[in-house]
Curated annotation (Swiss-Prot):
SMART domains: EFG_C (SM00838), EFG_IV (SM00889). This is Elongation factor G 2. It comes from the Bacteria. Residues 8-283 form the tr-type G domain. Disulfide bonds: none annotated. The gene is fusA2. It is found in: Cytoplasm. Pfam families: EF-G_D2, EFG_C, EFG_III, EFG_IV, GTP_EFTU.
Amino acid sequence: MARQVSLEKTRNIGIMAHIDAGKTTTTERVLYYTGVSHKIGEVHDGAATMDWMEQEQERGITITSAATTCFWRDHRVNIIDTPGHVDFTVEVERSLRVLDGSVAVFCSVGGVEPQSETVWRQADKYRVPRIAFINKMDRIGADFDRGVNMIRERLGANAIPLQLPIGKEDNFSGVVDLVEMKAIVWDDESLGARFEVVDIPADLQERVDSGRELLVEEVCTHDEALMDKYLGGEEITLEELKNGIRKACIDIKIIPVLCGSAFKNKGVQNLLDAVIDYMPSPVDVPAITGVVPDTEEEITRPAGDDGPFAALAFKVMTDPFVGQLTFFRVYSGVAESGATVLNATRDKKERFGRLLKMHANKREEIKQVYSGDIAAAVGLKLTTTGDTLCDPANPCLLESMEFPEPVIHIAIEPKTKGDMDKMGQALGKLVQEDPTLRVRTDEETGQTILSGMGELHLEIIIDRLQREFKVDANVGAPQVAYRETITKAVEVQGKFVRQSGGRGQYGDCWLKLEPQEPGAGYEFVDAIKGGVIPREYIPAVGKGAEEAAENGVVAGFPIVDVKVTCYDGSYHDVDSSEMAFKIAGSMGFKAGAAKASPVLLEPVMAVEVVVPEEYMGDVMGDLSSRRGRVLGMDARGGAQVINSNVPLASMFGYATELRSMTQGRATYTMVFDHYEQVPKAISEEIVARVKG
């Protein structure tokens, strides 16, 4: 089967936003207008096509990024709907990695909210071109100009409106298109599928003229040929203006802004047009780079069907009907179902079973995938998120993804022996799907410990264990992922000697332990001169120290941000071994850490609370009682926004508390910010609790 749509006519985009900005609804409308779904799915009916896991339909939020494909103006648009809840930022990170462009949806009332900032920073990191869509223009308190200004101020982005709204709140009826200089009004009866072009309303003419001037000037600033024409007083044609916007948008020099109300079916077709007109095709973005495995030689894989096959797996899911589904993005080349590919990350060959094009949770079987496609494969056994799949004859390793460390964990115990076996398999599958979920066994208690990005994240994992995998388990209260560190430098000897007849053991090293900058992690430095410890034993010292750091000296939490330098020692010709030096390194580290004034560290979260004025005092008082530090306040659409840093340990159950304190009128978001030292009194309580 030949390629249906050329690369130039392919768009891979994500839809990203804060929770409740209306992202899934926007995607639903896109699917409706492009003719993929014949009935509009509403999120609050629990019927949205993209939200297909049971938990998503119950909670009305999007958890996994479903990939779907649709057509508009002869172009193929692959859309990835990403979750907006902060516990699921990894989903956003992994989808941004494989997109060429993104639509950022903002709520016209709330404007730029904390999660929007997090997602925006992730998109900056991967240099993803964006279009902004200010949604919910029909809501009370809708304010387009404030939305545009917040994108400029809070996100530091050059937001340039391509449209202005006609009316607002209940009177929102259409938009003025500043590119084509025409007014568009939607017809409510045809669900917004029909619209008419009318004269620009006289009361808007002045705003429209200045908006148009700003747009033309801004586009010309980034294009010399257009600038010369503009300064020479010549008229810039529609085609030149559109090309200029496209170029500036792809280079992330401007962020085009559109507006509408997806729920009321207004503005979605224009958004689709903008995706086609201004978002990059796979050919317009820089070619992806990778390295040749083993040689570290850098290579690029430009988009095109002629090159060798190279793809990145960005999501693994367990599907009740076909088993494991691996979603991947093809960067170059072509592959057929049944083909053998190399997983360059693991250096193992895999075979594509069936290849599927996904439409939320419906699937269409395909025979081939081409450069620029996003598809799913059945039958890959070893591949996990972030792995590279490539042509075995032309191996190439694309850069993988980085995932944040989990901040919260819970203990979980299966109720019966039967559940025990099922739980092991189920957790194995879930970890493969979600790299931010960690599973380990606590050696002392024998409990299974799950670590994740937040309470909601772990709640949903437990829920899936019960629903999808039918595992019954007792779940402990969530625990904070404390860490330990040292606060002063020490020098210490680690010596392990056993010499009582026969082959003995002898390892002797001198270590210097120094505190590092927060976030620097563990570092081992070899400063041995003159062979006082033979080369081959030095890594063992480092390994011993690193393993000892897993269980700290204050309360058994991992020790972080420490630099260990091995600078002296001695050895025995016969009795020294790697094992002996590993034990010596471990003994030295433990002794040193205990002397180096060790302290407990706790995760501190950036908490933003949006609260009506009358509850302000209560909420501030409550944050202080949770050891929170208020960093600042500002007004946003009739409510107050409080920014603060609060230790995670004091935030358990905050959602319920906040709801009852403000009669459900306040909302909050929480993102991990940094680790900091625990106050002495609280540290003593924690130690007593752990050792008790």
